Structure formats: C-alpha cells, structure tokens
Amino acid sequence: MYTADAHCDALLKIAQSDSPLVNIDTLKKGGVGLQNFALFAPVESSIYEQQEMIKKEITLFHMCVKQSDNLHSNPFTFIKNDNTYTDAILSLEGAGMLGDNLDMWNDLKNKGVEMASLTWNERNNLAAGSSQPNRYGLTRAGKKVIQWQNNNNIVTDTAHLNEQSFWQVIELADTVVVSHTNTRALLDHPRNITDKQVAALVNKNGFIGLTFYPLFINGTNRADFSDFGRQVEHLCSIGASDIIGLGSDFDGISSTINGLSNPSDYPALINWLLARFDENIVEGLVGENFRKFWNRRRIKR
C-alpha cells in the first residue's frame, strides 16, 4: 500500500554523523512513496551556527537524491501513486535563524524548500512555540513571512506553535498543515491539537500528520498500535478522516510505538489498521491523503 510520511529528522542525524532510521533501505522496505525531510538546527545554537547547519543539511539532502535512484525530488512535478521509489520533499522546521530576511527565504525556496514552520517550541522573532503562554503569538515579522509564504506557494506548518500563533496562522495563511502532532482530546499535551483546531484544518483543506511518539500519544514512554488506533478512531469520528496521515517524527523522537521502529515496519501497521478500519480510511491515512494534499498544492504553481 502506498505510504507517505509528513515529517522526519533524518537530515539532522546525517549532519551529526549519526545513522538515521529513515534511509533508502528502510523507505524501500516500508513502501514509502513520499517522505518529507525537515531541515532543523538546534535552537540553543547561535544564529550563525543554525544557518550553517541548515546549509549543511540542504547540501546533504541534494547529495542523497543525486546518489540514489530510489529517491526523487522535483518540486514542479505531480506525485504519482507509485512506491517503487520515494518522492522527497524538503521543509524547514523553525525559522528563527531567517527572521523576515526575504532574501534568505527566497534562497531556501530556490534550493527546494516547499514547507516551513515559523518556530520550534520556543518563542522567537516570528512566533511563539508550544512551550509559550498564549499571550504571545505571531510578531509583525512573522506576519510578513506568512504573506511571503502565501505569495510563493509555501505551505505553513503549524506543528510546535502555541494556540495563539496557530489561530493567527489559520486566519492569515493560504495553505496550512500540522506535520507531526496528536489529538489533545486523548492526551492534554501542548504539542497536541484540540478538536476545534482539527475542525479549522478540515475547513481549511489542510493536513494533520500523526506522530509515533508515545509521550504525545498516551503520556508514557511506551505505546502500541492500539494506542495509535485510538487517535485515528477519534479523528475519524469528528470528520477528519480525509485530512489525517502519518507524521512519524522518526529520528526526532527518543521512543516510538512498539513494533514500529523505522519505516520498514509500516506493513505491520497497515495490516493492523486494515483489520480494524475500512480500507479507504487506511489508504488515506497511510499515504493518499498527504499525496493528494501535496498535489493540490503543486497545481497552484
């Protein structure tokens, strides 16, 4: 079954000379036809160090694509329902190192970035992250960047934003996703989203990627397929079945769902889901919803 993942941190792992869970071999074994690779630089680093890390990860991304026949990247083509290879998307997770420098934003776009979030968990010069009080939201610079994203058909990722920033993005941005999150109805965690936020994303024709991080799923260090299934069941019950998908956060989380250690384990998850949900729901969840969302975005070019 065609599989797509809206978020992983493999590029940071490679940049730090570590072996990523998301790699050519595991993507192929898992039948992954579409993978978003996030550019991320630790926010405790200096602005210069963050900028250099992002440059390094961009170079590594294009090197990986060039060296592998199984990894394709072309922001100007439609994504086919074909998992004999993996279409690779490039995104930016946290943009404090760019601020509202539009020359730098244009440079990232020219290097293939198609989606970006304004901040990580912290408050920066653009927005407030999920660890911040809701009295903080988008800054004037952040609103300027949202307008630039609209003008350049860049998807705005609201993962890691606090609620105040989220609602401002919903009001201002044309194309919105939450690339990796879970539902707050089942676990009240600031990185999870409320049913009201889910409804806003449905109305916006957005996308929600579900993580495999137990701490966001059930608040512990251990979760299994049934815990993940409850996330899916709840979101389907409130009308979100057409906009939910996978947002694994592989290579960015310290633990994952039991039996789902890397992308090669996706067939086991799919088989478990097929035994409990309608096939069309499972097809949408594991890949088709994200693929269709991305093609709707690319048709605007």
Segments from the language model and where they lie:
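Structural preference for beta-strand elements that scaffold enzyme active sites
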Residues: 2-5, 34, 87-91, 114-115, ...
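Active-site beta-loop-alpha junctions enriched in small/polar residues
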Residues: 7-11, 40-42, 91-95, 121-123, ...
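An N-terminally biased module of ancient metal coordination in phosphate/nucleic-acid-related enzymes
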Residues: 1-36
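A metal-dependent hydrolase metal-coordination microenvironment
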Residues: 26-103, 130-136, 140-143, 147, ...
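Histidine/acidic residue-rich metal-binding segments in metalloenzymes
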Residues: 100-110, 132-177, 190-204, 226-242
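Conserved, mostly hydrophobic/aromatic
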Residues: 7, 27, 112, 156, ...
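Short acidic/histidine-rich active-site segments
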Residues: 239-260
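Mid-to-C-terminal alpha-helical segments outside catalytic/metal-binding sites
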Residues: 261-301
